[in-house]
């Protein structure tokens, strides 16, 4: 009687983890931008739950303000989680192309928003002027407002580039992420307000 032996080749087994640790600068870039996103989301939570004065003009459009706050809280939460996933082993559970594209998309969105604001400020000669935010709840120098978004954009790009290199993700996903940035920014700045007007939550 012939005994049939089955040999399991290494290619039939689950491959060992291919996760490689990020560069130190990439890890700290991801941690810094995740902290920024969570802290910034905290500002929206504060505005949503009592941070706006009773006589603030925002109270006149409070329904729209609530929707926009919830939207940006969600976006910032996703941004923080994405940044952490790019430098942690548990991030390997997510598709690498999705992480790379999301990191570059976040970088593109923030840098584009900062660049547009900076361009308008320079054109209007208002770079050093003070600007009111959130219905006057915050007053900061105009240049600081642009910098507030530019710096995390650079951090997202740094961590995203390192993740792309380590994971061997194709460059096309980074490009697609960057191309998607203007679409998401347009949806937040123009698409959502348009929908809120249709819903009667913002004046026409």
Task: Give residue spans per PLM region.
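Hydrophobic cores of alpha-helical transmembrane segments in multi-pass inner/ER membrane proteins
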Residues: 2-3, 71-83, 142-159
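Hydrophobic alpha-helical membrane-insertion segments
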Residues: 35-39, 101-116, 184-189
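Individual transmembrane alpha-helices with interfacial aromatic-anchor signatures
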Residues: 134-151, 173-180
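Membrane-interface interhelical loops and short amphipathic "cap" helices
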Residues: 48-64, 122-139, 195-204
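Final/C-terminal transmembrane alpha-helix of multipass membrane proteins
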Residues: 174-196
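Transmembrane alpha-helical insertion/packing segments
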Residues: 2, 6, 12-59, 120-121
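Juxtamembrane loop-transmembrane helix junctions in multi-pass integral membrane proteins
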Residues: 14-31, 56-63, 90-97, 101, ...
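Cytoplasmic membrane-interface segments at the C-terminal ends of transmembrane helices
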Residues: 19-26, 84-99, 154-175
């Amino acid at each position: 009687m012939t005994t049939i032996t089955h040999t399991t080749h290494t290619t039939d087994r689950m491959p060992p983890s291919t996760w490689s640790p990020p560069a130190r600068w990439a890890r700290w870039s991801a941690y810094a931008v995740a902290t920024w996103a969570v802290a910034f989301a905290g500002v929206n939570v504060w505005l949503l739950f009592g941070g706006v004065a009773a006589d603030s003009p925002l109270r006149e459009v409070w329904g729209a303000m609530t929707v926009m706050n919830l939207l940006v809280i969600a976006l910032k939460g996703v941004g923080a989680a994405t940044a952490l996933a790019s430098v942690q082993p548990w991030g390997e559970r997510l598709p690498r192309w999705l992480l790379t594209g999301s990191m570059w998309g976040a970088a593109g969105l923030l840098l584009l928003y900062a660049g547009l604001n900076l361009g308008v400020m320079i054109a209007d000669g208002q770079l050093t002027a003070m600007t009111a935010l959130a219905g006057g709840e915050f007053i900061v120098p105009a240049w600081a407002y642009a910098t507030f978004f530019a710096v995390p954009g650079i951090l997202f790009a740094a961590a995203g580039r390192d993740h792309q290199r380590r994971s061997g993700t194709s460059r096309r996903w980074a490009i697609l992420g960057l191309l998607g940035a203007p679409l998401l920014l347009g949806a937040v700045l123009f698409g959502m307000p348009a929908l809120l007007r249709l819903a009667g939550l913002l004046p026409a």
